[in-house]
């Protein structure tokens, strides 16, 4: 008995402290209300019970009842038939309270019944068969036809969201799809493979079977329908013309038509793209596709031009890939020959025989090479002095080779001859100067001061450019001529070209330097042989002998070198949705000493990657996110296994390619939006959307809609452009309060992402154009005094109840003499 009373006490306490005074969920006073009911539910279900206040005794229901909605005298609102959203999605009713005389004493108030959708309709194609055509080489992804289906279910719910898919392509060659369909719009276009392969000569006809499913195609219980699509492949006349040839420096009036392009259908808008970014682009195109050169061209300035012709629709969107236009500028003879230097100097020994070659004289012509306009002819037109006779020299008419023409020269006759050479092409002539110096005969060979320069030991990390040895040879021929000048060559031992000898022209001293890194592993000991020789040939009977050769031994010591990477930066490109555990790249290094190399990662701050220590293969270990880091950079450390454990580093850059995985959101914080109450006219405000995915060259194209259908009678969202939209009121009958308006934003990506954002709009009294909120108690929020009063009242009621319970318990004890508490204690 006591436990039952305590249980009742607890329930009563909870009721008093927790639920007293709250309005019921399924009943309440007469006021405007909105109810949501799923279609297809069994009839005669109670929706709500309205309570009438005297003198009201009954209710009257009017409006769009359609004979479905009824109300009893006691205020029970119910429906008598199954609701069908496709017949009527929203029922607007009026409910009034009547007195016993049938007069309205309260209301009428609006009652809105929203019929919620269920998936009870199958999507249906508008046609059982579609026909379309596409040009070969059309731009992939550009729609050339659409298939359309309808579904009577609510398009704002998954029930009415359609998903298109190509299920069969005939013929399907090599299992390659040539066509693709936009899953949401039904737009059919070519795949990249189809753009390249389709040929009306090989296969002019294709058939597709296309299906459409509701529930976004994501539910196994979704309904579907199919249709047939016949596609004809037509020839594409949007082709690049043959390369054009234009003679330079044309004097005809410009512009001059040089070629033409043509789109497959009328109405295209043509333009040219200056691919090479020339400051003055000398070409233009008209709207017939005719391409013109607008000014004379200069081949010596630019011998060819490459640019693109594009065709766009009336909205400025490309109809296909641009065509490459190639123009070759044909040479004319508009440049005279030029001398390579003010004076060309040759040397000849005084004992040279008749016909000996002195040198090759050359000039230059800026006209096109290997063309008649640039073929040069040489002729000697003057000699100074003419001693011992004129015409001592000959020159090859086309080769420019200068030879002795009559006899050997003597320095005592003249140490120098000045020749004038006429250089000509088919139209122009130029005079150039040639100086021939007569030098002593080369009858002395260079002689090394030492034949053996000993040996030297160097570490393999000796710096490039270091001088490791100085060698010296002498020549007794005439100083500062080609007969006495010494050139040093390494004729034995340096097969890899790691060394070089640089000669001082004043002293003929040779400096042996390191040209490439030394390598102990391939050449630990090298025997080097040097040769000293003259640029001028030796006279007959004189030959280089052992005096012109010297030797040197180079020993290279080992240096424990770090592992070597073939490159300092390794890069791989992967999609950001790459699965965990996927191999994303490989890094390799080689140890010069042949030791095994172990790999590890450094600066792997996000822990996205791991590396196989043996192979250098790199794998993903966590979800990748381009919005967090578009290029993830880590260091790869290669360490010797054994030895001195030396290490080296390289960089691995993982470039993350974007997938559409971020829903749209508001571009900034839109708190503080308000309208002055009351509205004198419908108002509007503008907001901007963005998302965190990588944006293409074209700006994003978001679509906007209200997040709830019930808001459509009060609000409207209209798109301004791809990123901005306008939220507008549809009337002025708003209460002075805060409205939270959900906005549905779709990015139209692949796959599409949707986000629901909320705009809080306040309707308030305004002072000087700003929202005015007077200080004071707000309706519905209790004051401190009210809270204290409620607590005191609650505790008072609890105290009374406790007192009643304990009195009752005491009374029960008195009435029960067998109770242990009523028996006297025994001593």
Swiss-Prot record:
Glycans are attached at residues 148, 183, 249, 418, 545, 573, 721. Its main location: membrane. The keyword Transferase does not apply. Keywords: Calcium, Cell adhesion, Cell membrane, Glycoprotein, Membrane, Metal-binding, Repeat, Signal, Transmembrane, Transmembrane helix. GO terms for cellular component: adherens junction; basolateral plasma membrane; catenin complex; cell surface; plasma membrane. Residues 22-786 are extracellular. Residues 29-127, 128-243, 244-339, 340-448, 449-565, 566-666, 667-776 form the Cadherin domain. Liver and intestine. GO terms for molecular function: beta-catenin binding; cadherin binding; calcium ion binding; integrin binding; proton-dependent oligopeptide secondary active transmembrane transporter activity. Residues 808-827 are cytoplasmic. It is a single-pass type I membrane protein. SMART domains: CA. Three calcium ions are usually bound at the interface of each cadherin domain and rigidify the connections, imparting a strong curvature to the full-length ectodomain. Cadherins are calcium-dependent cell adhesion proteins. They preferentially interact with themselves in a homophilic manner in connecting cells; cadherins may thus contribute to the sorting of heterogeneous cell types. LI-cadherin may have a role in the morphological organization of liver and intestine. This is Cadherin-17.
């Amino acid at each position: 008995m006591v436990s039952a009373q305590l249980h009742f006490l607890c329930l009563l306490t909870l009721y008093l402290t927790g639920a007293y005074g709250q309005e019921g969920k399924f009943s309440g006073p007469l006021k405007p209300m909105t109810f949501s009911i799923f279609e297809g539910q069994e009839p005669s279900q109670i929706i709500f019970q309205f309570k009438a206040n005297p003198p009201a005794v009954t209710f009257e229901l009017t409006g769009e009842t359609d004979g479905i909605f009824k109300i009893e005298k006691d205020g029970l609102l119910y429906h008598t038939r199954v609701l069908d959203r496709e017949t009527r999605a929203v029922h607007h009713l009026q409910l009034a309270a009547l007195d016993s005389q049938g007069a309205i004493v309260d209301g009428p108030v609006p009652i809105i019944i929203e019929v919620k959708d269920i998936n009870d309709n199958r999507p249906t194609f508008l046609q059982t068969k579609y026909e379309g055509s596409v040009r070969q080489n059309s731009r992939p992804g550009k729609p050339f036809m659409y298939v359309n289906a309808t579904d009577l279910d609510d398009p704002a719910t998954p029930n009415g969201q359609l998903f298109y898919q190509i299920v069969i392509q005939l013929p399907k060659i090599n299992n390659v799809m040539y066509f693709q369909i936009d899953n949401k719009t039904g737009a059919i276009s070519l795949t990249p493979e189809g753009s390249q392969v389709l040929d009306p000569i090989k296969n002019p006809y294709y058939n597709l079977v296309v299906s459409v499913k509701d529930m976004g195609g994501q539910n196994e219980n979704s309904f579907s329908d199919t249709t047939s699509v016949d596609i004809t492949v037509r020839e594409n006349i949007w082709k690049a013309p043959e390369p054009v040839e234009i003679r330079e420096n044309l004097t005809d009036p410009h512009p001059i038509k040089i070629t033409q392009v043509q789109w497959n259908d009328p109405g295209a808008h043509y333009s040219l793209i200056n691919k090479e970014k020339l400051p003055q682009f000398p070409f233009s195109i008209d709207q017939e596709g005719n391409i013109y050169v607008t000014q004379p061209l200069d081949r010596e300035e630019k011998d060819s031009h490459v640019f693109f012709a594009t065709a766009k629709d009336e909205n400025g969107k490309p109809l296909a890939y641009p065509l490459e236009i190639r123009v070759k500028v044909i040479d004319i003879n508009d440049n005279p020959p030029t001398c390579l230097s003010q004076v060309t100097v040759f040397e000849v020994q005084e004992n040279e025989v008749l016909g000996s070659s002195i040198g090759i004289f050359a000039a230059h012509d800026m006209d096109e090479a290997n063309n008649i306009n640039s073929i040069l002819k040489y002729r000697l037109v003057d000699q100074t002095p003419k001693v011992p006779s004129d015409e001592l020299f000959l020159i090859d008419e086309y080769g420019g080779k200068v030879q002795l023409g009559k006899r050997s020269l003597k320095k005592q006759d003249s140490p120098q001859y000045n020749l004038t050479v006429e250089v000509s092409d088919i139209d122009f002539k130029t005079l150039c100067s040639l100086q021939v110096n007569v030098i002593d005969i080369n009858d002395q060979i260079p002689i090394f001061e030492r034949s053996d320069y000993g040996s030297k030991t160097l570490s393999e990390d000796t710096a490039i450019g270091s001088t490791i040895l100085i060698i010296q040879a002498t020549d007794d021929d005439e100083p500062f001529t080609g007969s006495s000048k010494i050139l040093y060559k390494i004729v034995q031992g340096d097969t890899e070209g790691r060394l070089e000898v640089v000669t001082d022209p004043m002293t003929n001293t040779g400096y042996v330097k390191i040209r490439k890194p030394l390598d102990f592993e391939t050449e630990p000991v090298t025997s080097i042989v040097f040769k000293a020789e003259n640029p001028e040939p030796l006279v007959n009977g004189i030959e280089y002998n052992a005096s012109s050769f010297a030797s040197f031994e180079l020993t290279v010591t080992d240096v424990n070198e770090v592992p070597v990477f073939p490159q300092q930066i390794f890069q791989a490109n992967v999609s950001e949705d790459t699965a965990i555990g996927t191999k994303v790249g490989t890094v390799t290094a080689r140890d010069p000493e042949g030791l095994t190399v172990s790999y590890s990662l450094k600066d792997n701050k996000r822990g996205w990657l791991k590396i196989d220590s043996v192979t250098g293969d790199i794998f993903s270990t966590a979800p990748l996110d381009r919005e967090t880091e578009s290029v993830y950079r880590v260091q790869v450390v290669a360490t010797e296994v054994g030895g001195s454990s030396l290490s080296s580093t390289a960089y691995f850059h993982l470039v993350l390619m974007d997938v559409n995985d971020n829903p749209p959101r508001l571009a900034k914080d839109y708190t503080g939006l308000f309208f002055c109450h009351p509205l004198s006219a419908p108002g509007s405000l503008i907001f901007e959307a963005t998302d965190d995915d990588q944006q293409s060259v074209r700006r994003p194209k978001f679509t906007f809609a209200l997040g709830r259908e019930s808001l459509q009678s009060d609000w409207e969202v209209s798109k301004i452009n791809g990123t901005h939209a306008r939220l507008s009121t549809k009337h002025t009958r708003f209460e002075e309060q805060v409205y939270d308006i959900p906005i549905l934003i779709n990015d139209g990506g692949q796959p599409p992402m949707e986000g629901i954002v909320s705009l809080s709009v306040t309707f308030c009294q305004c002072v000087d154009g700003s929202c005015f909120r007077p200080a004071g108690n707000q309706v519905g929020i209790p004051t401190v005094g009210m809270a204290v009063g409620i607590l005191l009242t609650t505790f008072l009621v609890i105290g009374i109840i406790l007192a009643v319970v304990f009195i009752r318990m005491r009374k029960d004890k008195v009435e029960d003499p067998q109770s242990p508490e009523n028996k006297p204690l025994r001593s």
